[in-house]
Amino acid sequence: MIYQMQMPAKIEVDEATHTDQYGRFIAQPLERGYGVTLGNMMRRVLLASLPGTAITGIKVDGVFHEFSSIEGVREDVPEIVLNLKKVRFKSTCKRSCKTTLSIVGPKDFTAGDIVAQEGEFEVLNKDLYIATVNEGSTLNIDVYIGRGRGYTPAEESRPDSMPIGYIAIDAIYTPIRNVKFAVENTRVGQRTDYEKMVLDVETDGSITPDDSISLAGRIINEHVTFFANFSPTEEEFTEEEYKQQDDEFETMRRLLNTKIEDLDLSVRSHNCLRLAEIDTIGDLVSRKEDELLNYKNFGKKSLTELKEQLEKFELKFGMDITRYQMKG
């Protein structure tokens, strides 16, 4: 007989304190020791593994290194860099982009002046102060913005080919401002040695607390699945079965690498996928339905059309395609 471990029926939400940027989540009852185990896992993944958008570098006219001062600007480059690290974005782009700004004085340069040239991102903390440009002066600055996870120091975020005067910035990608958890005792029947784990999550507004813990949970689940599916004994296959398995694997990999434009889709669906930077069938099936519906101009009609196309290949949304080692 397998011992049945005590598990939470559901995750409770503290509705009294819940906002778009803060959430308190309660998991109970848990077996002794699992409060700390789950709390640590969630905290680490939330802080280090969730994707986000950040400024990765700048280029200022007339400036050739990061310790310079800028004529007609009150702040020097190190102060401006420190302020730019605090800018928070909401973005669905996967690739890096650049925006060019020309700030004419007299003016306080704020984060709201950083505008996407093609709508790739939105600044969330628009009132954040960056610098003051004096009367009669102009600050011409290129701002480089990228996607990533957690935190990447400046020396690791430098692109392979940099323009002269490019200044790399420590990129704080994580959309999570703060995470903490506490473990308390809780009662089940007559037993009082079970645990309750309380998880507090604060985000920068680019993702809700609910979505952040859901994404963190999926990341953890994808990793522990390898252990759950582990078998110490290898099945014996005939040479013919091995060949058939290899052929099926290669067929699936080629299918997942098929370009979206090769599908028989409406112009509207093609445009929606292009704007979402979904280039291959593999990119598409790795997304969940609710994730697609969050993209701009992507509606249920487009979703139904895509479902019908995927069903032709016996594919579906939300597939785990990591084993096929997709190439760019």
Curated annotation (Swiss-Prot):
Reactions catalysed, as given in the entry: RNA(n) + a ribonucleoside 5'-triphosphate = RNA(n+1) + diphosphate
GO molecular-function term, one example from the UniProt record: protein dimerization activity
Annotated InterPro entries: DNA-dir_RNA_pol_insert (IPR011262), DNA-dir_RNA_pol_RpoA/D/Rpb3 (IPR011263), DNA-dir_RpoA (IPR011773), RBP11-like (IPR036603), RNAP_asu_C (IPR011260), RNApol_insert_sf (IPR036643)
A GO-annotated cellular component: cytoplasm
Official protein name in the record: DNA-directed RNA polymerase subunit alpha
Known EC number: 2.7.7.6
Domain of life: Bacteria
Similarity comment text for this entry: Belongs to the RNA polymerase alpha chain family.
Region feature Alpha N-terminal domain (alpha-NTD), mapped onto this chain: 1-231
Enzyme class, first EC level, given as a word: transferase
UniProt region (Alpha C-terminal domain (alpha-CTD)), positions on chain: 247-328
GO biological process per UniProt: DNA-templated transcription
Function according to Swiss-Prot or TrEMBL: DNA-dependent RNA polymerase catalyzes the transcription of DNA into RNA using the four ribonucleoside triphosphates as substrates.
Known partners and oligomeric status: Homodimer. The RNAP catalytic core consists of 2 alpha, 1 beta, 1 beta' and 1 omega subunit. When a sigma factor is associated with the core the holoenzyme is formed, which can initiate transcription.
Keywords: DNA-directed RNA polymerase, Nucleotidyltransferase, Transcription, Transferase
Pfam families: RNA_pol_A_bac, RNA_pol_A_CTD, RNA_pol_L
Entry comment, domain topic: The N-terminal domain is essential for RNAP assembly and basal transcription, whereas the C-terminal domain is involved in interaction with transcriptional regulators and with upstream promoter elements.
Native organism: Chlorobium luteolum (strain DSM 273 / BCRC 81028 / 2530) (Pelodictyon luteolum)
